[in-house]
């Protein structure tokens, strides 16, 4: 440093080392969840909190553990729910049940006969399909060199994969005038997003939501009522500002081995316009599929227009009806064509899935509200920073011994927060945070902006008026969270700016 002799520089270095030898502070002082859009670190490890503590003279990373107090945990849960855009903690009626003690064979047989609910720890068809979507997103992120969370593989317990139907023979494929039916099961199961159209739906959507069928019992077949199989879905819990970009109804088809084993079926899905007591309902044809009796897997029907109508005018939501006609023009019971209803296995239940994208007006309103909260937080933190602004040039001698600005590990555990009953995946994610000194000279690895370099020079000349540059995120990535809502519908939502990927001086 100009004006200081060799001995004086050595004394300054020694004094800086002496002042930095105290016990390292707990960092961050309060666990806050992931880095938000304004660069503010939100982060949490639940209970316990895990934050990286870089030792003063060691490059190895360790973790500090501290049990959260009740009010701290409650406040942290509230803040993370706010980041996730949820007004309260969902409490689904049929969420993720924890595995229980083994049951007797007689009890197990009676439970399998009822088939109303899956065994504890197992998922129904809609959550399994959404889990496939989640893992598909995670796989794409890994291929791009980005790990946004912990993947969760679906259990292979005899379920039919949400992958497209098995073809009976190479020559039969040409008879299907729509998308191919579903692919092989769990052994070599492919993602359900096998078409470019489905991939585009997922890439363009901010949120994917599945809906369970609300019809408790399948109606008995009646020759007078051709469209007898009905399905109803509750779309009242869609968040404000979300618009439907695509929607599909999915029903599982088993292989037919009875009297119709050599038949070809025309399966039609209708929107119910008006219900009548003594005659068939007024219906509007939405989509059709032609399938072979020997095919099995998930069938998809496009109901995008109907879903948009139901969202805008909920009173028009009277459900869907399905009919099956043979090539001879005979209307048959869908069960005879292999279609699975409410009385079928829990992992083959029919469901609806919709893709949503948030409107720009709602995004601007949300951002303005959240920015005001962050500004209040910054104002409180700035008051404490002003006290320590009066630094001198000798600070840079001592700061050279501190860790330079870089990314540190910070893991947010949803399981530690007690949310394992409604968050399906991930169990947690690496939020990370930025910390360290932005000391002069700013090296290339500090990712300093030109403004930060100029601010550093001005700080050297006027340390009492101009603060040092701050270590802040320069690259933020999104995560995907799969969870239940209060109605046991499954939601897959992307959250932007949740993971710190790189840090720099600003």
Curated annotation (Swiss-Prot):
Family membership noted in the UniProt record: Belongs to the TGF-beta family.
Organism per entry: Rattus norvegicus (Rat)
UniProt keyword annotation of Secreted present: yes
Record field: compositional bias (Low complexity): 96-112
Protein name: Bone morphogenetic protein 6
Oligomer status and interactors: Interacts with SOSTDC1. Interacts (when glycosylated) with type I receptor ACVR1; the interaction may induce HAMP expression. Interacts with type II receptor ACVR2B. Interacts with Hemojuvelin/HJV. Interacts with ERFE; the interaction inhibits BMP-induced transcription of HAMP. Interacts with BMPR1A/ALK3. Forms heterodimers with BMP2 in vitro; the heterodimer then binds to its receptor BMPR1A /ALK3 and may induce HAMP expression.
SUPFAM superfamilies: Cystine-knot cytokines (SSF57501)
InterPro entries assigned: Cystine-knot_cytokine, TGF-b_C, TGF-b_propeptide, TGF-beta-rel, TGFb_CS
